[in-house]
Regions:
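Hydrophobic/aromatic-rich transmembrane helices and adjacent perimembrane loops
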Residues: 122, 129, 173, 315-346
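Membrane-interface transmembrane helices that cradle and orient dolichyl/undecaprenyl
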Residues: 43, 47, 98-100, 137-154, ...
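Short acidic/glycine- and proline-prone juxtamembrane loop motifs at membrane-interface regions
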Residues: 31, 55, 121-131
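Signature aromatic-anchored transmembrane alpha helix within multi-pass, membrane-resident enzymes
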Residues: 10-11, 159, 196-199, 341-373
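Extracytoplasmic catalytic/substrate-binding loops of multi-pass membrane glycan-assembly enzymes
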Residues: 23-38, 50-65, 72-75, 170, ...
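Membrane-embedded, lumen/periplasm-facing catalytic core of multi-pass transferases
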Residues: 361-417, 425, 431-432, 517-528
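Membrane-lumen/periplasm interface segments of specific transmembrane helices
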Residues: 19, 191-271, 301-305
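Perimembrane helix-loop-helix junctions
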Residues: 142-145, 150, 173-203, 272-279, ...
Length: 678
């Protein structure tokens, strides 16, 4: 019996995992870039608990383990979401078995849960709310599984809620349901156990925070961004989540939950009416204990999520921006409840004679309907990913000297997808550039400086969800056509989900002047400073412009210092080079920092110069050379702790882009094994 249950659980997991891989959408959420950067920081430099995202360790701990074991890749980034969302089917199966359903019925119920549109959607995206949903699901399982062992139940539930709390503070929204469970059923030992365990666990964690950041409650001081909702918009805000559940995406008009909420409410209404009409207690139409438990759980969570203010100020009603992924934690209990109600239909007297056939007849079409609606729910992400991966493939094949694309797309290409071992493309990431007119202005201003063969990606807008549809190189929003020097390489599928549909396109720059890499470098015109001979004033005014990001203006002052005060020009040489680095002019920055390292071998700036040179090499696609420079810096400049620690962190990142711990262990084992076999 145990073997059959394990095999059933394995089949559920594999089915769910395969469905999530099939409908995989990629990095299409607006905060994916921020969270990926967070994970890289934690992996290379450790967490900074003064930041609210770092503080919420439940958001990144699974990805940290995945990167540590498998190395940094899209696959290892998404593995926790694919795997943990697939586990929810096993949790559903285990709960249904505890509530008295047969193995086949529980298996079909688990299939219904893992195939539900929103469950699949959350599993195909980098949705951190999924981890709170998992904590709630495991807490519910522990509550049911250990009812006869209240001490163990209390400890398990407390641990689940503690972990969920450090994904999102919204974990406290389950406390009313938990209180109803313990008080209504007079489970005083369990209530005492979960209370004491929670106090001990949270108390120890708060003591840890105080030791680390000097505050017992940093999650109150650093919390998510919220906004004061005007009174005339309260109804609109309160209707946001219900509309997402019942109508779907307001951006694309696609479903999110499919038929699940309609099935849930329709069957629940039947049960409520049947219970009110006092049908026999043995009737499957009567509300049972599991119905009440699930209803109180998802119902109270929804009410608090929708109406309770977000924040710790009460001078107005504060809310976070209401986006679809925030509903994720309540999706599992809702979907499980719908599955249970469908299974209860198969227990009606007319169907009870053949329960297996009834369950198959009812649940298999429901699962197929789920999959059909899942395709609709994930369609925008699928369309985007198809174009994204096709563009990536062509860029990898072409290996252009430079690549120009929307900032987020470019950063993913450079930092996640392009092979650091073979890529030699300088991917231009235009930070702080958002709307199409900004990108168009940048392109027209810099086109003359781009080398022959530079590639440009257009039509591939920024992230899919949260409305960044007018960001990036969107030709439909350009004020004029591209320069005729841009030659079309390929047109990809049309991004039909956009308000103004546009195909992704890849372009190559032709007829650009070829500039010798070792040619003479332009010098700044310092004639405007001919009468200024005060070293202190030149330094002050140059740094003032540097701090205001007027790098071209700052370089005039630094050049004047370098020419007129060569014996005191050390700082000016460094910031002169750094100004090019700040502008992402990697070739020029590398050249200037090399000059500094050669001329000022014993300068306090030399270690920092080596770090900047290595970073330029990496951004120009030469990871091998970057690694050599970083290793040199660590070996020869340990006396500069800041530069050495930066170099160590960057070395770690470069190595983890190639492989993780398991890869290194495999090489260590397989190498001697191959030599022995030979």
């Amino acid at each position: 019996m145990r073997t059959r249950s394990l095999l059933t659980a394995l089949v559920l997991f594999l089915f769910a995992f395969a469905v999530r891989r099939y409908f995989y959408c990629g990095l299409v959420l607006g905060d994916d870039g921020q969270e990926y950067a967070l994970m890289l920081h934690v992996l290379s430099r450790g967490p900074d608990f003064h930041d609210q995202y770092h503080l919420r360790f439940g958001v990144w701990i699974f990805n940290y383990l995945s990167f540590f074991l498998f190395g940094i890749s899209e696959w290892s980034l998404m593995l926790p979401n694919w795997a943990l969302s697939s586990v929810l089917g096993i949790v559903a199966y285990a709960l249904l078995r505890r509530w008295g359903y047969g193995q086949l019925q529980a298996f079909l119920g688990g299939l219904f849960v893992v195939s539900a549109p929103f469950e699949v959607l959350a599993g195909t995206l980098r949705v951190n709310d999924l981890f709170l949903g998992l904590a709630m699901a495991l807490g519910l399982w522990a509550l049911v599984r250990f009812e006869e062992r209240p001490l163990l139940q209390g400890l398990a539930v407390a641990l689940c809620l503690w972990f969920g709390f450090y994904v999102k503070l919204w974990a406290v929204y389950v406390l009313p349901a938990l209180g109803v469970y313990y008080v209504a059923e007079r489970r005083w030992r369990g209530l005492a156990a979960v209370t004491v365990a929670s106090l001990v666990i949270h108390g120890a964690t708060c003591a840890f925070w105080h030791a680390k950041v000097g505050s017992y409650l940093p999650f109150i001081e650093a919390h998510a961004v919220n906004w004061a909702v005007p009174r005339d918009r309260l109804v609109e805000v309160f209707l946001t989540y219900p509309k997402l559940i019942f109508q779907g995406s307001s951006e694309f008009g696609t479903t999110l939950f499919g038929a699940v909420p309609y099935l849930l409410l329709a069957l629940l209404l039947v049960k409520v009416l049947a219970t009110a009409l006092r049908v026999p207690a043995s009737s499957p139409l009567r509300l049972d204990r599991a119905d009440r438990m699930l209803l109180v759980l998802w119902g109270s969570f929804f009410l608090l999520l929708d109406f309770f203010p977000n924040g710790f100020q009460f001078d107005a009603y504060y809310s976070v921006p209401r986006i679809f992924r925030y509903i994720t934690p309540m999706s599992f209990p809702m979907t499980l409840h719908a599955a249970k109600l469908l299974l209860d239909v198969t227990r009606l007297p007319a169907l009870a004679a053949r329960p297996a056939a009834a369950a198959l007849t009812l649940l298999v079409p429901a699962v197929l309907l789920n999959l059909y609606q899942t395709d609709e729910a994930t369609k925008p992400g699928q369309i985007y990913r198809r174009a994204f991966m096709a563009v990536l493939h062509d860029v990898e094949e072409a290996r252009p000297p430079k690549l120009v694309a929307e900032a987020l797309v470019a950063s993913y290409f450079r930092d996640l997808y392009l092979d650091p071992e073979t890529n030699r493309t300088d991917v231009i990431v235009q930070h702080h550039t958002y709307k199409t007119p900004e990108y168009e202005a940048w392109l027209r201003a810099h086109e003359s400086s781009l080398p022959e063969g530079t590639m440009l990606v257009t039509g591939l807008a920024s992230y899919v969800h949260y409305g960044a549809h007018e960001d990036g190189y969107r030709l439909t929003y350009f004020s004029a056509p591209l320069s005729p020097r841009w030659e079309l390489v390929r047109t990809y599928n049309v991004l039909t989900y956009l308000p103004r549909p546009e195909p992704a396109r890849l372009w190559r720059l032709r007829g650009a002047p070829t500039v010798a890499a070792d040619g003479p470098l332009p010098r700044e015109d310092v004639s405007s400073l001919a009468d200024v001979n005060d070293f202190v004033a030149l330094t002050r005014d140059g740094m003032a412009r540097y701090q205001k990001e007027d790098y071209a203006g700052a370089r005039v002052y630094f050049r004047k210092i370098i020419d007129d005060f060569p014996d005191r020009a050390e700082d000016a040489v460094f910031f002169y080079a750094a100004s090019f680095f700040r502008q992402s002019d990697w070739p020029r920055a590398r050249k200037e920092f090399k000059r500094l390292a050669i001329k000022y071998r014993d300068s306090r700036w030399t270690p920092a110069a080596y770090w900047h040179i290595a970073t330029c090499d990496r951004n120009l696609g030469d990871s091998r050379r970057a690694q050599e420079r970083l290793e040199y810096l660590v070996a020869h400049h340990a006396d500069d702790p800041l530069s050495a620690s930066r170099a160590s962190a960057d070395l770690k990142m470069l190595r983890m882009r190639r492989e993780g711990l398991l890869g290194r262990l495999w090489r260590a084992w397989a190498g001697p094994a191959r030599r022995h076999a030979a």
